[in-house]
Amino acid sequence: MQLKIYSSNKNYIQRGTKAFTEVTIAFFLAGFSTFSTLYCVQPILFLFSKEFSLNPAQSSLSLSASTAMMAFGMLFTGPLSDSIGRKVVMSSSLFLASFCTFCCSNMNSWESIIFMRALTGLALSGVAAVAMTYLSEEMHPSVLSFSIGLYISGNTIGGFLGRFLSSLFSEYFSWNIALEFISFLAFTSAVLFVYLLPKSKNFCSSPLDLRKILLYFIFQWRDPVLSKLFFMGCILMGSFITLFNYVGYRLISQPFFLGQTTIGLLSIIYLIGVYSSPQAGVLIERYRKGVILTLALTMMIFGVLITQCNIVLLIIVGLTLFAAGFFAAHSVTSTWISQCSKINKGSTSSIYLFSYYLGSSIFGTFSGIFWITEKWLGISIFIITFLCIGILLSIRLLQYKNI
């Protein structure tokens, strides 16, 4: 099988240049558009349950359908970007996702909502699969970890604003108007993204070959380091989505009885990722990645344990610690994937993110069974079990040199 190898003679983007500023702003907008449209339904799952007479596991399908289709789409959009270019794939994805979100806001049956949410996820796969590949190709290696950390920070802010605005508009207007507003912001972000993002200078096109995609998928999973990182992504995102899918159900019920807008404000916790993601990028320049990853996973476990308290302030502390650990761990694994992949970076990133979002879909809905039977304790046991598996994987990764 022929694989594309990238030349070391590249025209990288350096920190402090105009191009660096444009890329930073463009990817912040892409992150906002992607994660606001993807996660705008998460804080209003309770409203879906109420309006369509659904249990929490059924309501979570509005998010799981999107992340499942995003995972599936990334198997093809990454290789597609290897063929036709990074910018065209990302730009098309942003416009299509904003259109699908607008259509979703006008649906009046649960089945049609799920269908449009699935299409939204499929559209967004083009951004999620290609963004880190663009950065790893265009940014100078000395600022790659920092740039990926900033990109993830932008995703964090986008996810926060999408969730908060969705909650706010849903409480004072309706969830339909909330989604319409999100779609308008996403469309505006897409226009600015196209204008700001520089064309790839280090991109080398390779023909699209579906047979090679399948063979490369198998080839990457046989790599002892990459395969563990792929499964790590599944655990990380699955645990994160599970926690925040069901914490709203807990806090909106007795003994807390928090309002919809207040639940949405919990999304501000995600802003801890603005700090923890770049910091993790700095730490892995000084210490072994496996060590930092293990510490981040341990933080997540302690965060879940703290949320067992029936005091709102302590629950917020636990959620914050959990989120900080998650974004640090995601930053480490994202950088790790980029550095381990020396060939066909778009395909490698796609496989990692396929695992990442597939974990979100499976964990996010399947864990609803634990909520139905054991409420918050069941959710916590579910998450901690998989995070412990993640720590075991991280320890195994320490046996490899330079990791």
Swiss-Prot record:
Membrane-spanning ranges: 25-47, 62-81, 88-110, 114-136, 143-165, 175-197, 229-251, 256-278, 290-307, 311-330, 350-372, 376-398
PROSITE patterns noted in UniProt: MFS (PS50850), SUGAR_TRANSPORT_1 (PS00216)
Subcellular location: Cell membrane
Assigned keywords, A-Z: Cell membrane, Membrane, Transmembrane, Transmembrane helix, Transport
Protein name stated in the entry: Uncharacterized transporter bbp_532
Stated family: Belongs to the major facilitator superfamily.
GO molecular function, one term: transmembrane transporter activity
InterPro entries associated with the record: MFS, MFS_dom, MFS_trans_sf, Sugar_transporter_CS
Topology of the protein relative to the lipid bilayer: Multi-pass membrane protein
Gene Ontology cellular component terms for the protein in this record: plasma membrane
